[in-house]
UniProtKB/Swiss-Prot annotation:
Name the UniProt record assigns to this protein: Dol-P-Glc:Glc(2)Man(9)GlcNAc(2)-PP-Dol alpha-1,2-glucosyltransferase
Transmembrane domains' residue ranges: 7-27, 65-85, 98-118, 127-147, 151-171, 176-196, 257-277, 284-304, 318-338, 366-386, 393-413, 437-457
Enzyme Commission number(s): 2.4.1.256
A cellular component annotation (GO) from this entry: endoplasmic reticulum membrane
Any Pfam family: DIE2_ALG10
Reaction(s) catalysed (UniProt annotation): an alpha-D-Glc-(1->3)-alpha-D-Glc-(1->3)-alpha-D-Man-(1->2)-alpha-D-Man-(1->2)-alpha-D-Man-(1->3)-[alpha-D-Man-(1->2)-alpha-D-Man-(1->3)-[alpha-D-Man-(1->2)-alpha-D-Man-(1->6)]-alpha-D-Man-(1->6)]-beta-D-Man-(1->4)-beta-D-GlcNAc-(1->4)-alpha-D-GlcNAc-diphospho-di-trans,poly-cis-dolichol + a di-trans,poly-cis-dolichyl beta-D-glucosyl phosphate = a alpha-D-Glc-(1->2)-alpha-D-Glc-(1->3)-alpha-D-Glc-(1->3)-alpha-D-Man-(1->2)-alpha-D-Man-(1->2)-alpha-D-Man-(1->3)-[alpha-D-Man-(1->2)-alpha-D-Man-(1->3)-[alpha-D-Man-(1->2)-alpha-D-Man-(1->6)]-alpha-D-Man-(1->6)]-beta-D-Man-(1->4)-beta-D-GlcNAc-(1->4)-alpha-D-GlcNAc-diphospho-di-trans,poly-cis-dolichol + a di-trans,poly-cis-dolichyl phosphate + H(+)
Free-text tissue specificity from the UniProt record: Highly expressed in brain, skeletal muscle, uterus, small intestine and liver. Moderately expressed in lung and kidney. Weakly expressed in heart and stomach.
Topological domain spans for side Cytoplasmic: 1-6, 86-97, 148-150, 197-256, 305-317, 387-392, 458-473
Subcellular compartments: Endoplasmic reticulum membrane
Gene (name only): Alg10b
GO MF terms held by the record: dolichyl pyrophosphate Glc2Man9GlcNAc2 alpha-1,2-glucosyltransferase activity
Amino acid sequence: MAQLEGYYFSAALSCTFLVSCLLFSAFSRALREPYMDEIFHLPQAQRYCEGRFSLSQWDPMITTLPGLYLVSVGVVKPASWILGWSEHVVCSIGMLRFVNLLFSVGNFYLLYLLFRKIQPRNKASSSIQRILSTLTLAVFPTLYFFNFLYYTEAGSVFFTLFAYLMCLYGNHRTSALLGFCGFMFRQTNIIWAAFCAGHIIAQKCSEAWKTELQKKKEERLPPAKGPLSELRRVLQFLLMYSMSLKNLSMLFLLTWPYMLLLLAFFVFVVVNGGIVVGDRSSHEACLHFPQLFYFFSFTAFFSFPHLLSPTKVKTFLSLVWKRRVQFSVITLVSVFLVWKFTYVHKYLLADNRHYTFYVWKRVFQRHEIVKYLLVPAYMFAGWAVADSLKSKSIFWNLMFFVCLVASTVPQKLLEFRYFILPYIIYRLNMPLPPISRLVCELGCYAVVNFLTFYIFLNKTFQWSDSHDIQRFMW
């Protein structure tokens, strides 16, 4: 059975890589010059490729650290030595973009290993389900598209997933080192390094919580009634747990590599004067709470075969009626957050090359009341996401939610790329769906990818004040 699964995996990876190479060829023919953010990334990588590493050579418009450029040089330079290629060839636009295609292969393998580690291997979860889940996430439209451009997404996801995998296997020093590599690609990846530390803490809290519940059961104490009572009991437990010096010392011994990484991050923020390097004018942090609602909607859209069904809607409505007071409070809080904390970034309104421009224009700008009318949909999407993670412990869910808030809420710009990592982490930890739903999901992703690539490559346009060819993209 294991050998058969290996054949399935090899076939899926080979087919995906073949299709990716064909798409890469189409991209290379259509895009012979840097496009969008590549106008900053590619020249910087080429300067590094030429050995010009001084700070005076740094483009101040770049807001991320040089992880992508350093790894690219580490990949393409040995190729020039081994194959005898000229510097002009190995530092070309095509070769640098190809680095991300290599990252996509690594991401495919890491996703497969993570599914094998996270999902219990029993008769209920077949090898076909794991392979299909891996294939589906590997071609997840928002991530897959950026495998063909010189952006930080593919490498950022690679090192973050690698760090998560090492954490699950207990190699925490390696995990923290890989987390640092992820941070070098995108500063906000420090949150997912903290997520790895949180995973350990959640695991230990779950073990202690089970012991506590068993003790209460033996003492025949009444169980908690209702979610608020349960939450209060969990918070009391966490308070008591954190007051124990023995528990704190044990957690520190397990998480010290991550603590060192977080300390280094705080030193960086103090010395740098903020999390962003380079141009900070367009990357202002704020409390943009509706970003959570956008993420839940994004997740419901891309996971609709698993989250949307008449049964789920009926269950949700029944729960709303049963706990109408609690849901009324949640609704009022949500409306208040939408009212007071909705921000519209200047890029969202100015750049008509991104799909988010059209989502905002054709949905949110139709009428001022639309953003409030969407609150019930946000609530259903949030409940559906939480319900699909009920197999995880309450401590894991709390830790994931904290990291989700930290990675989305401070972002002023509505940008689907910011949702890639939290979505992948969510999808990895959701129980393996039935094969029929996975096939449906994969088919939908294939259609979305086809449309995205077709529109990007064929439906070009020009601005009135520029002769440059513009393209639609995520």
